[in-house]
Amino acid sequence: MQTNVENLGALERRLNVSVPQEKIETEVESRLKRLARTAKFHGFRPGKVPLKIVAQQYGPQVRQEVMEDVLKKNFSEAVRENNLRVAGYPRFEPKLAESDTAQVEFSATFEVYPDITLGDLGGAHIERPVVEVTPADVDKTLEVLRKQRVEFEPVDRPAQAGDRINIDYRGLIDGAEFAGGKAENFSLVLGEGRLLKDFEEPLLGMSPGQSKTFEVAFPSDYHGKEVAGKTAVFEVKLSGVESSKLPEVNADFATSLGIAEGDVEKMRSEIRANLEREAAKRVNARLKEQVMQVLIDTTSNIDPPKALVEMELDRLMEDARNDFASRGLDTKNFSLPHDMLQERAQHRVKLGLILGELVKMHNLHPKPEQVRAVVEDLAQAYENPAEVVSWHYAAPERLREAESAALEDNVVTWVLEKAVVTGKPMPLDELMGRS
C-alpha cells in the first residue's frame, strides 16, 4: 500500500491510496471459494458447485464487498501511519490509474481536528452565587403549594380578583367573528393574567347573570396575527362566580403532602431541605455556565470542522423535532432553517473540542462511582429510583448522558481550582430566575 496526503485547506485533507490489484483479486477468489463450500445450485451437490458458476452468480457482489473492505482497512491504516485525527466521515472516490493498471487507486477527502491551544485560566474570574434559604422562602413555597390545592365555592356577589368566573363571550372585528373569539362556559381566575388586561379588567365587578359589551385592543405583537394590532368588540355574559378558598397550613395540610403524623414543623424542614437541594443544583449550573464561557474566551480562535458542525446541526434539529412531538405537535413536515441553529451548533462543537483536549491533557475522565452518583441523582426524580438506575445500567449507551455530566463536573472542578472565584450573595428568587 502506498499513500500520500494533500493539504486542501486549514483542516481539509485528501489521502491518496494505491493498493495492488493482485491483492484484491486474491481476496475475491478466496471469498468465492469459501462461498462455494455452502452455495446451493440446482443440479449440484452442496460444496460441489464449480467456482466459475459461483463467480458468475456472486462475483460482482463479492467484488463490491471486497472493495469496500479494502477501502476501509487501508484508509484506517493510512490514517494511523500519517497520525491524522479524522473529523466526521471521509468521502471516498475511485481514481483512474494513468499507467500502472496493476494498482487500484482511490482518494479519501475529509477534515481533521484542529490543534487546540488552551489559554491561561489564572486570571479568569468566576462568581459563585451564595444563597441562604430563609423562612420567607419556605413561606413562599408553602403559598405556592396552597394555591395548587385551592378550592372554589359558588358565591352570589360581584366578581373580584382571585375569583373563578364562568362566562360566554363573542368577539367581533369590523362586525365579523374571528378565530378564537367565541366561547361558552369558559372558566378563568381573575388576576392570574391568562388573558389580556383589556379583557379581564371589565369583568371585575360583574355579577352572575350580568352582560357587558366592551372593546379590547390587541397588541401589534399579539401571537394571533389575524387580530394583532386590531380592536375587537366583545359581548360577555357572566353566569357564575366562585370564591377561592386556600387550605390552612395545619396537620391536615401536612398530611396531604405526605408528612407522617401531619407534623407541620417537619413539613417546613423538608421544604427547606428541598429548596437547599434545588439551590445547590442551580449554583452548580451557574458555575458550569461560567466555566464553559471562560474556556471559550481563553482559548485561541478555533475553526471547527464543517463536518462536526453539520452533525451537531442534525442533532439540534432532531432535539427540536422531539421537543415538538412531546408537546403533541405535528412533526411530519417539521423543519427549521439551519441559520437559526448554526451559531449554537458552532459554539457546541468548539466547546466539545476544548473539553476533549482538556480531558485528554489532564486525565479528567469520570470514574465509575462518579457516573453512578449522577445516575442515582437523576433517578430521584422518579417514583421508583432503583428501577431507573437498573434501566440505565442495562445498556451501555444509556449511560452516555450521565458520563458526559460527570465529565463536565470534573472539568468544572478543575477550572475552579485554577480561576479566581469570588462569592456573590444572591436571594433565592434571583437564583431561581423568579425576580
UniProtKB/Swiss-Prot annotation:
Keywords associated with the record: Cell cycle, Cell division, Chaperone, Cytoplasm, Isomerase, Rotamase
Subcellular location: Cytoplasm
E.C. no: 5.2.1.8
Segments forming domain PPIase FKBP-type: 162-247
Record keyword Calcium present: no
Domain notes for this protein: Consists of 3 domains; the N-terminus binds the ribosome, the middle domain has PPIase activity, while the C-terminus has intrinsic chaperone activity on its own.
First-level EC class: isomerase
InterPro entries per the UniProt record, alphabetical: PPIase_dom_sf, PPIase_FKBP_dom, Trig_fac, Trigger_fac_C, Trigger_fac_C_sf, Trigger_fac_ribosome-bd_bac, Trigger_fac_ribosome-bd_sf, Trigger_fact/SurA_dom_sf
Reaction equations catalysed: [protein]-peptidylproline (omega=180) = [protein]-peptidylproline (omega=0)
GO terms assigned for molecular function: peptidyl-prolyl cis-trans isomerase activity; protein folding chaperone; ribosome binding
UniProt function note: Involved in protein export. Acts as a chaperone by maintaining the newly synthesized protein in an open conformation. Functions as a peptidyl-prolyl cis-trans isomerase.
Family as reported in the entry's similarity comment: Belongs to the FKBP-type PPIase family. Tig subfamily.
Protein's name in the database: Trigger factor
Matches recorded under Pfam families: FKBP_C, Trigger_C, Trigger_N
GO terms of biological process kind: 'de novo' cotranslational protein folding; cell division; chaperone-mediated protein folding; protein transport; protein unfolding
NCBIfam families documented for this protein: tig (TIGR00115)
GO cellular component: cytoplasm
